[in-house]
Amino acid sequence: MKAEIEELQRSFGEIRLFPENSDDLWHLHNLITPGSLVYATTLRSVEGSQDKIRPEKQEKRPVRLGIRVEDVEFHEYSIRLRVFGTIESGVDIGSHHTLNLEPGYEISVIKSWSGSDLERIDRAIKGSTSEAIHILTVEEGEAELYRVQSYGPKQVWSLAAGSGKTAEVSSREEFSEAVVSQVSQLTGPLVIAGPGFVKEEIIAKFKRKNPSRSAPLVIGDTRAGGRRAVQEVIGQGILEKLNGDLQLAREVTCLDELMRRIGKDEPVAYGIDAVRDATGCGAVQTLMVVDTLLRDPDAADLIRQAEAMRSEVVIFSSRFEPGERLAGLGGIAALLRYSIA
């Protein structure tokens, strides 16, 4: 993502944003909230004198509109962001319109920006200069490859070995050759992780096949394979070492600490009412909010209050397991400095 930030007056103002990939659209999905004013060039039907006689001949032309946002949808597989709202600037003021944003579009967003918003923009800018990180998880007879997106790991390939109906290769040799062949196509940083010694065999073959590879290769020891191994790797801080991105690791470690404290009956709050009480007492050390609540006025107000008290604020991705677990606790929780019971 590229961004041009005008001087903000008391955190309010205009920021021009230039999304470059699906990760950037995901960031925009969390930055554009109801009530924001978004300017973008879009296609809209323009009526002429002939159009009134033959409305089916209405022509769509590019126009620049300002939309007062009502809702936003992120479509991961079509790589598109849909912004719904009412036109406040441009043609047909007062009419409803949907902006269909894709990588390469330029938009301007006018709103009150929170500290977590500006942190997200900074993260997106830094992420645009980094190559994609892949994590290969390997255990006996099973391999899965994940691409690390801003909103969590996405499985892009898998392979099973054995004699069952779901097996794709039958021998250990075929399995390791197929895995090495697949990951040898990658050019960016690679993490190979899993329990036991199977990964060691894969790593040795990979290095023999790619002796001149310059991108980082990191080994991760985990207790499990598959998606659980990916979460372990992220929690170990390996992504931070590869590209400096702390966010996903923060989500893992904060959720782990929350569950540990709940299990030991140590100071925490979860659910909107309990967190509101803790915030009012100034007891919040770390506020955790799942991104689906960013459009909720009560949650947004608690974020602003927490930032004003210099509490840490961590926004969780609803598409990553820690965020899914946080959603099960009401979508918002806090680690407290002291008990308020």
From Swiss-Prot:
The subcellular localization recorded is: Cytoplasm
Look up the record and name the cofactor or cofactors this protein needs.
a divalent metal cation
What keywords does the record list, in alphabetical order?
Cytoplasm, Endonuclease, Hydrolase, Metal-binding, Nuclease
What Gene3D superfamilies does UniProt report for this protein, alphabetically? 3.30.1330.30, eRF1 domain 2 (3.30.420.60), Pelota, domain A (2.30.30.870)
Isomerase is among the record's keywords: no
Q: What broad class of enzyme is this? A: hydrolase
> What InterPro entries does the entry give?
eFR1_2_sf, eRF1_1_Pelota, eRF1_3, Pelota/DOM34_N, Pelota_arc, Ribosomal_eL30-like_sf, Transl-rel_pelota
- Enzyme Commission number(s) from the entry: 3.1.-.-
Q: Which GO terms describe its cellular component?
A: cytoplasm
One Pfam entry for this protein is eRF1_3
Q: Which SUPFAM superfamilies match?
A: Dom34/Pelota N-terminal domain-like, L30e-like, Translational machinery components
What's the subunit arrangement here? Monomer.
Function of the protein? May function in recognizing stalled ribosomes, interact with stem-loop structures in stalled mRNA molecules, and effect endonucleolytic cleavage of the mRNA. May play a role in the release non-functional ribosomes and degradation of damaged mRNAs. Has endoribonuclease activity.
**What protein does this entry describe?**
Protein pelota homolog
- Which organism encodes this protein? Methanospirillum hungatei JF-1 (strain ATCC 27890 / DSM 864 / NBRC 100397 / JF-1)
